Amino acid sequence: MDLWRVFLTLALAVSSDMFPGSGATPATLGKASPVLQRINPSLRESSSGKPRFTKCRSPELETFSCYWTEGDDHNLKVPGSIQLYYARRIAHEWTPEWKECPDYVSAGANSCYFNSSYTSIWIPYCIKLTTNGDLLDEKCFTVDEIVQPDPPIGLNWTLLNISLPGIRGDIQVSWQPPPSADVLKGWIILEYEIQYKEVNETKWKTMSPIWSTSVPLYSLRLDKEHEVRVRSRQRSFEKYSEFSEVLRVTFPQMDTLAACEEDFRFPWFLIIIFGIFGVAVMLFVVIFSKQQRIKMLILPPVPVPKIKGIDPDLLKEGKLEEVNTILGIHDNYKPDFYNDDSWVEFIELDIDDADEKTEESDTDRLLSDDQEKSAGILGAKDDDSGRTSCYDPDILDTDFHTSDMCDGTSEFAQPQKLKAEADLLCLDQKNLKNSPYDASLGSLHPSITLTMEDKPQPLLGSETESTHQLPSTPMSSPVSLANIDFYAQVSDITPAGGVVLSPGQKIKAGLAQGNTQLEVAAPCQENYSMNSAYFCESDAKKCIAAAPHMEATTCVKPSFNQEDIYITTESLTTTARMSETADTAPDAEPVPDYTTVHTVKSPRGLILNATALPLPDKKKFLSSCGYVSTDQLNKIMQ
């Protein structure tokens, strides 16, 4: 509803301006709402044409003044035609007496001045305007409510510092409180508001109210002129005083180049935008061109199995047998099993079990006919479960060939015949058990340990048949039993890794005790089992040492016609020296000679290094390589 009245009032005002001679306008404005008159006092003045109060102010809370307008009536413009009356309320009651204004001149025209004699603080005042007894306007207030101090005076500024580039500077603005306000005694407390701007600007920059009379202004451009103004008000009140005079701040002349640099602002924002866009484009191009490589870096493929000499397709197809075959061919892929091998403390000879007695033993095949022995030696069986065996045909070929070259001979014999003849060198110990020479043999072979499986095997033919066939052989009286061990016990291991062997023989404990028929044979005709390519040292010693003690009629010297069977010269040297001292000390045991493995000539053959003793002068050996032939052995035995 009020909005319609506002619009109506505005329309009437415009019409009054357009038609100044109209007499209906004052009557209409007189009916306007008092709310509109409070909103716009000028409307109230123009509506009635009567004088109205404009303001009342006290600059220092000790005196105050009130002001009014003249009005439209020319008769009221005559001095003294309008009177101001005031009254004070004491003890919550108005005095019945109204008093006229004490001073119409000191505050100016159309005003009334109340000095300190007529001013009372915290006491309400009521004032009214009258002309010829008619009430024109009235107003009520207290002095503390109308306090409006004078503007500050004495504005000044001081330069604090200048920035390093010489573009901006800091100043401090100071002023004095209005002289009318008794600020020093604390009768009134003022606060100040500062406004500043550049000369060419239209909008003032306002700072927060402060209580002090100085304030710093920062970052003012040195190439611009600035304006500063200040106004004051009583603390906790809303009415400010008028602004002080404008203070102009002009800095000294500065470098033009610095001003140009300040005016030029680098477009950092645009550069950042274009930079981000360019980096995004470059990343997109790189990712698009290198997408395969980036994919491999992020998700690397599973590596293809690459083994030298093996087709990867075999692994993909799962053909493990072919892969294992290829790995077995290449030496680099073969596993090293030698680290898992354990040391062998002593060597055992595995003889066939009792249920295999029907089969012929290797030694019996050797003692049979040449045709049978040659056929049997090819079928020799090595059933030692991985341990070294004396029944090794490969050693015969290698060792005999080496000894032939050392002796300067070039005879080559069949391995079957050589093993058969070498086997005839050692006689059966069972038939010599009751002979005088039996004790000496037992004392010479204490170092070989026989296994529980060592059992005597029957000969290829019967004992009777073999007895009748003995005279036709080169040896005089071979014995049927040939299960005599020619193994050497390992006694020590050298720091360099060599194996030290202890030679010797021990008569088997499981020999049959019931044989009464003894064959007469010379001690040098023992049935040596020549299943290896060398003579045992202890056997050679027994043949040499026992020869002087036997009767000439019963001793048939062995004739070693096998030119490819050898024994070591060191062993013969030792046994020869022992045979010389047999007369003086017939019961003394020869000191066993220890030897070491010199080298491996074949997968199952060994060459031994024996401890050699000085040879007697009367025994001259033609071979210097450590082996002698059967001819040389015959000469030594003579």
Curated annotation (Swiss-Prot):
Region (Required for JAK2 binding), start-end ranges: 295-380
Main location: membrane
Gene Ontology MF terms: cytokine binding; growth factor binding; growth hormone receptor activity; identical protein binding; lipid binding; peptide hormone binding; protein homodimerization activity; protein kinase binding
Residues where Phosphotyrosine is found: 487, 594
Tissue/organ expression: Highest expression in liver. Also expressed in heart, kidney and muscle.
Cellular component GO terms held in the UniProt record: cell surface; cytoplasmic ribonucleoprotein granule; cytosol; external side of plasma membrane; extracellular space; growth hormone receptor complex; membrane; neuronal cell body
Role of this protein: Receptor for pituitary gland growth hormone involved in regulating postnatal body growth. On ligand binding, couples to, and activates the JAK2/STAT5 pathway.
GO BP: any one term: response to food
Signal peptide start-end: 1-18
UniProt-annotated location(s): Cell membrane
Domain notes per entry: The WSXWS motif appears to be necessary for proper protein folding and thereby efficient intracellular transport and cell-surface receptor binding.
Motif annotated as UbE motif, chain positions: 341-350
Motif (WSXWS motif): 240-244
Transmembrane segments: 266-289
Subunit structure of this chain's protein: On growth hormone (GH) binding, forms homodimers and binds JAK2 via a box 1-containing domain.
Cross-referenced Pfam families: EpoR_lig-bind, GHBP
Protein name as annotated: Growth hormone receptor
Region (Disordered): 357-389
InterPro entries linked: FN3_dom, FN3_sf, GHBP, Growth/epo_recpt_lig-bind, Ig-like_fold, Long_hematopoietin_rcpt_CS
Membrane side Cytoplasmic: residue ranges: 290-638
Residue positions the entry lists as glycosylated: 115, 156, 161, 200
Ranges for domain Fibronectin type-III: 151-254
